[in-house]
C-alpha cells in the first residue's frame, strides 16, 4: 500500500464530545429507525424474494478467467487483478508449531468498508445494505453502505460501479468521522487491509431498494442475532468512538449492574499513561516473537494436495481452497466464478471478562498469525478451531480454552454465530461468546495476556494494526451490551 493511502486513512478530523454524544444517542436508539426493528426481518426477506441468487461449488477447470499458473501453480486471475491464491512458508517461535506451509490469499489492494450516516429527526442513522455474498450461509447479511475492493470500484470486473462509493473517495462529498486502516484474517489473508470509514452527509441521499436507514442501536441489536450483521459491518462498528475524555454513555442507576459495568468500561483507563502502558505491553509481546512469512509458489507447499475440486491438507484439518460459480441479480456483475477458502469446521472465539471495581475488563491476547504485517495483533482470549485439538492432551491446549468450553451457561453474557467475510470465505462461521468470570480469575495472566477496558481497546482502534478482526467483532458485540436501546 502506498504511503499516501496510509496517510489519507488516518486523516479524519478528531471527534469532539458533540460527535461522540451523537454516536452514543444513536446507539441508545433502537426503536425509532426509519424501519422499525420489528419489521427489519420482513424487509430482509423481501429483498431476498425480489432477487435471485445462486452459489454452487464447481471443479477448478470450470473457473472462468482463473487458472493455475504453469510455473508456480498459483491460482491467478487472467487480468492479474483481484487476488491470488499462493503459498506461504512460515517460521516462528510462537506456539507449538515452529514451521509450516500453507496456501494463503494475497490481495494487495486496500478495500473500502464505509458506512454513510445522516441525521434524521435528530438521530444519526446508518445507510445499510442487504448484501449477497457467495460465502454467506444465509445469502443476505447486513453490510456497510460500501464494501468494495479497488478492483470493484475501478470496475476491473467490467460491471457497474458500487452504489454510493463516491462518498468515500476523495474529500468533499461528506464529513469524514472515522477513517482507519484495519487488517483481516491473518491465517487466511496475506497482509490484507481495508479502510474502515464513517462519512456523514447533510444532503438528501436516494435510497436504493437493497438499502435502508437504521440507527446504530438497531444495528447493534441485530448483532445479537445469528448471521445477520456481516463481518465488514462489525469491524466498522468497532472503530466508532463511543467515548472521549468528557463523554460516554450515561445510564440510570437502576440499570442492570452488568450493563453499567460495560458502560463504565468505555471511559475507564483511557488516560495517556494507561494507554502507554497497554501499548508497551503489546510492543513487548511482539518483540518476544519472531515471524518469518515467505511467499512461495503453491507448488512448493508441503503437506497440501490438489484434486479436481479442492486444495486440502493431508490431515483433513484447517481449511480447503475450493471453486464456486455465482449468480446474483443485484450485484455489479450478474455472474462470475472465483476461488474461495472453506474452513473445515466452525471456530470458537471467546472473550473472558470480569468486573474490577465495578468496571468491566476483557482478557485479550497478543497473537501471532502468519499473514499479519507486524507479527502480532491483539486477539480475544480464545480463538481457535476446537477440532484441531481433539487428539491433543488438554495441557497442550491454548490457554483458557478449557475455561471457555466448560463455562456455566449462566455466565455467558453474549453468544451469537457470526459469519466471516463472505466474499472470500465459504460458509465460514464462528461461535462468538463473551463469558464473565469471577473477579480473582487470572489475576496475574500469562505474559501474552492482559486485562483491558473497552475504552482502552477503543483508544487503540483509533490506530491501525492493534486489534485483529476477531477482537474487533467482539468489541462491537460489547457495544451491543450497553446499547440495549430505549
From Swiss-Prot:
Pfam family, one: Hexose_dehydrat
UniProt keyword terms in alphabetical order: Lyase
Reactions catalysed: dTDP-4-dehydro-6-deoxy-alpha-D-glucose = dTDP-3,4-didehydro-2,6-dideoxy-alpha-D-glucose + H2O
InterPro entries to which the protein is assigned, alphabetical: EvaA-like (IPR005212), EvaA-like_sf (IPR038153)
Coiled-coil region(s): none
This enzyme's EC code(s): 4.2.1.159
Subunit note: Homodimer.
Name of the molecule in the record: dTDP-4-dehydro-6-deoxy-alpha-D-glucopyranose 2,3-dehydratase
Gene source species: Saccharopolyspora spinosa
Amino acid at each position: 500500500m502506498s504511503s499516501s493511502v496510509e496517510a489519507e486513512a488516518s486523516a479524519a478530523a478528531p471527534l469532539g464530545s458533540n460527535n461522540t454524544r451523537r454516536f452514543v444517542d444513536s446507539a441508545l436508539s433502537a426503536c425509532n429507525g426509519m424501519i422499525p426493528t420489528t419489521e427489519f426481518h420482513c424487509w430482509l426477506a423481501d429483498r431476498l424474494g425480489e432477487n435471485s441468487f445462486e452459489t454452487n461449488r464447481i471443479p477448478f477447470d470450470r473457473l472462468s478467467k482463473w487458472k493455475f499458473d504453469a510455473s508456480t501453480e498459483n491460482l491467478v486471475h487472467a487480468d492479474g487483478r483481484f487476488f491470488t491464491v499462493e503459498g506461504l512458508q512460515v517460521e516462528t517461535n510462537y506456539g507449538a508449531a515452529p514451521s509450516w506451509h500453507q496456501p494463503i490469499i494475497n490481495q494487495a489492494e486496500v478495500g473500502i468498508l464505509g458506512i454513510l450516516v445522516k441525521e434524521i429527526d435528530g438521530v444519526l442513522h446508518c445507510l445499510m445494505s442487504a448484501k449477497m455474498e457467495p460465502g454467506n450461509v444465509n445469502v443476505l447479511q447486513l453490510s456497510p453502505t460500501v464494501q468494495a475492493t479497488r478492483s470493484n470500484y475501478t470496475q476491473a470486473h467490467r460491471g457497474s460501479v458500487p452504489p454510493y462509493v463516491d462518498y468515500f473517495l476523495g474529500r468533499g462529498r461528506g464529513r469524514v468521522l472515522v477513517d482507519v486502516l484495519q487488517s483481516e484474517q491473518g491465517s487466511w489473508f496475506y497482509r490484507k487491509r481495508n479502510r474502515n470509514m464513517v462519512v456523514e452527509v447533510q444532503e438528501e441521499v436516494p435510497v436504493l431498494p437493497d438499502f435502508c436507514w437504521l440507527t446504530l442501536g438497531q444495528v447493534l441489536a441485530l448483532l445479537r442475532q445469528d448471521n445477520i450483521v456481516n463481518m465488514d459491518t462489525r469491524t466498522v462498528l468497532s472503530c466508532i468512538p463511543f467515548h472521549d475524555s468528557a463523554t460516554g454513555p450515561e445510564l440510570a442507576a437502576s440499570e442492570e449492574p452488568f450493563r453499567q459495568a460495560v458502560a463504565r468500561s468505555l471511559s475507564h483507563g483511557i488516560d495517556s499513561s494507561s494507554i502507554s502502558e497497554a501499548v508497551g505491553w503489546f510492543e513487548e509481546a511482539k518483540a518476544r516473537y519472531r515471524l518469518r512469512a515467505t511467499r512461495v509458489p503453491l507448488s512448493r507447499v508441503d503437506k497440501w494436495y490438489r484434486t479436481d475440486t479442492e486444495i486440502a491438507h493431508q490431515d483433513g484439518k484447517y481449511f480447503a481452497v475450493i471453486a464456486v460459480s455465482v449468480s446474483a441479480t443485484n450485484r455489479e456483475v450478474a455472474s462470475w466464478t472465483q476461488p474461495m477458502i472453506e474452513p473445515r469446521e466452525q471456530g470458537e472465539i471467546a472473550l473472558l471478562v470480569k468486573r474490577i471495581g465495578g468496571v468491566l475488563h476483557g482478557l485479550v491476547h497478543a497473537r501471532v498469525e502468519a499473514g499479519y504485517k507486524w507479527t502480532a495483533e491483539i486477539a480475544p482470549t480464545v480463538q481457535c478451531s476446537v477440532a484441531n485439538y481433539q487428539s491433543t492432551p488438554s495441557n497442550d491446549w491454548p490457554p483458557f480454552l478449557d475455561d471457555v468450553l466448560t463455562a456455566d451457561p449462566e455466565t455467558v453474557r453474549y453468544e451469537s454465530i457470526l459469519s466471516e467475510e463472505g466474499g472470500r470465505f465459504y460458509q465460514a462461521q464462528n461461535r462468538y461468546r463473551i463469558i464473565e468470570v469471577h473477579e480473582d480469575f487470572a489475576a496475574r495472566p500469562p505474559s501474552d495476556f492482559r486485562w483491558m477496558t473497552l475504552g482502552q481497546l477503543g483508544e487503540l482502534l483509533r490506530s491501525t494494526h492493534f486489534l485483529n478482526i476477531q477482537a474487533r467483532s467482539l468489541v462491537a458485540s460489547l457495544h451491543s451490551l450497553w446499547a440495549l436501546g430505549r
